[in-house]
Amino acid sequence: MAYPFQLGLQDATSPIMEELTNFHDHTLMIVFLISSLVLYIISLMLTTKLTHTSTMDAQEVETIWTILPAVILILIALPSLRILYMMDEINNPVLTVKTMGHQWYWSYEYTDYEDLCFDSYMIPTTDLKPGELRLLEVDNRVVLPMELPIRMLISSEDVLHSWAVPSLGLKTDAIPGRLNQATLTSNRPGLFYGQCSEICGSNHSFMPIVLEMVPLKHFENWSASMI
């Protein structure tokens, strides 16, 4: 989860988020190098009155500043395309969960189980227990098995929503009349928080998402107790 004054991304919990973090660092380094070069050239132009007459009309320079940006864009695009294809892969999910966005709560249905469905509302600040997080706790958490591929089917009952869990690298739009899907795999157990990430009305800020990733045995015990 995020912390006050945090500058970086949240700790990666899924393979996809690890790839996104590496891509972020890769792209940021390229941007940093380009920005440093541009600032260096600007400082030279401001601190010297000398000019090189041949650079005002130099075919070689124009060729270089055409080819070099193209190479840099390719270096950014190739890892990005690889991650996009990874995010679209569906590797035989062991579990499918359907989530529907409402104003202003989420409902979940475990499609592999009969009658295993519930609504998930934010817990009001006045009802929080010591140690719980304001605007992020819910009355019913989404319990899922860790280290296994899970498919999420996401849609909406009313307006546009967006189901997002940053530490898993997930953000999928919930669109009325359309069923979007995403896959997630958690590398470790724990609680992972997210929120609706699409403006959906006056209580948009009060639609938290809480995933509880547990070992498979604990998940089986939980699902048996819920049915």
UniProtKB/Swiss-Prot annotation:
Gene3D superfamilies reported in the protein's UniProt record: 1.10.287.90, Cupredoxins - blue copper proteins
EC numbers for this chain: 7.1.1.9
Keyword Membrane carried by entry: yes
Membrane topology according to the record: Multi-pass membrane protein
Topological domains annotated Mitochondrial matrix: 46-59
Cofactor(s) listed in the protein's UniProt record: Cu cation
Residues annotated as binding Cu cation A2: C196, E198, C200, H204
GO BP annotations, alphabetical order: ATP synthesis coupled electron transport
Coiled-coil regions listed: none
Subcellular location: Mitochondrion inner membrane
Keyword Protein transport tagged: no
Cofactor, how bound (note): Binds a dinuclear copper A center per subunit.
Residue intervals annotated with topology Mitochondrial intermembrane: 1-14, 88-227
GO cellular component, one term: mitochondrial inner membrane
Protein residues bound to Mg(2+): E198
Reactions it catalyzes: 4 Fe(II)-[cytochrome c] + O2 + 8 H(+)(in) = 4 Fe(III)-[cytochrome c] + 2 H2O + 4 H(+)(out)
Residue numbers binding Cu cation A1: H161, C196, C200, M207
A GO molecular function held by the record: copper ion binding
A Pfam family annotated for this UniProt entry: COX2_TM
Transmembrane region(s): 15-45, 60-87
Predominant location category: mitochondrion
Alphabetical keyword list: Copper, Electron transport, Magnesium, Membrane, Metal-binding, Mitochondrion, Mitochondrion inner membrane, Respiratory chain, Translocase, Transmembrane, Transmembrane helix, Transport
Function text: Component of the cytochrome c oxidase, the last enzyme in the mitochondrial electron transport chain which drives oxidative phosphorylation. The respiratory chain contains 3 multisubunit complexes succinate dehydrogenase (complex II, CII), ubiquinol-cytochrome c oxidoreductase (cytochrome b-c1 complex, complex III, CIII) and cytochrome c oxidase (complex IV, CIV), that cooperate to transfer electrons derived from NADH and succinate to molecular oxygen, creating an electrochemical gradient over the inner membrane that drives transmembrane transport and the ATP synthase.
Family: Belongs to the cytochrome c oxidase subunit 2 family.
Protein name: Cytochrome c oxidase subunit 2
Organism name: Batomys granti
